[in-house]
Amino acid sequence: MNIPPYRTRIKFCGMTRVGDVRLASELGVDAVGLIFASGSSRLLTVSAACAIRRTVAPMVNVVALFQNNSADEIHTVVRTVRPTLLQFHGKEEDAFCRTFNVPYLKAIPMAGAEAKRICTRTLYLKYPNAAGFIFDSHLKGGTGQTFDWSRLPIDLHHPFLLAGGITPENVFDAIAATVPWGVDVSSGIELQPGIKDGDKMRQFVEEVRRADGRRQFGVA
């Protein structure tokens, strides 16, 4: 049995403002996500992403999110933005994802009928080189919609992040129910797409820490 750590990792995704990234770093967030998927309301240009990248504190991961982007686009981001992780939300296959010599996470949509057929063995066969998985409600992410957490594959030995409609109000229950390696939030800490709310960011981190305290010490 895979025993999870007591400290749940936190990723704030869809970051578009330097001030929000600085606050995330101050709050001890483990990773910030920068979106390069065409059509996203949180889409960044490479130059804007580079400006944000320069403000990220040491030991905070920078995750570059793609969805069916071309290899040239991804190579440009890898070379200029220097992400520490890549995150793929499209139809990318393992061979493509590992082309860029950067560890990658694969997002798995969980809200549709396809989710009923997802099993651990299938994930490992399709993405044997994935550093971990992100279970989200929909493929594109950032929808603010949850999914049935009981659909999560069992016996996962790779780290996984829970996403999809996670908010300061439900993240405590989400961690208690699924015991994830980490949680991934975007719309749940926003005033509007790409514009984060400092109070919600703080509350989210506080609720994650409270959930971890309960798991470790049995206190609410």
Swiss-Prot record:
Enzyme class: isomerase
One Pfam family per UniProt: PRAI
Molecular function GO labels: phosphoribosylanthranilate isomerase activity
InterPro entries, A to Z: Aldolase_TIM, PRAI_dom, RibuloseP-bd_barrel, TrpF_fam
Gene3D superfamilies documented for this protein: Aldolase class I
Keywords: Amino-acid biosynthesis, Aromatic amino acid biosynthesis, Isomerase, Tryptophan biosynthesis
UniProt keyword annotation of Isomerase present: yes
Pathway: Amino-acid biosynthesis; L-tryptophan biosynthesis; L-tryptophan from chorismate: step 3/5
GO biological process, one term: L-tryptophan biosynthetic process
This enzyme's EC code(s): 5.3.1.24
Catalytic activity entry: N-(5-phospho-beta-D-ribosyl)anthranilate = 1-(2-carboxyphenylamino)-1-deoxy-D-ribulose 5-phosphate
Keyword Amino-acid biosynthesis: yes
Family per record: Belongs to the TrpF family.
Protein name: N-(5'-phosphoribosyl)anthranilate isomerase
Species of the source: Xylella fastidiosa (strain M12)
Lineage, opening ranks: Bacteria, Pseudomonadati, Pseudomonadota, Gammaproteobacteria, Lysobacterales
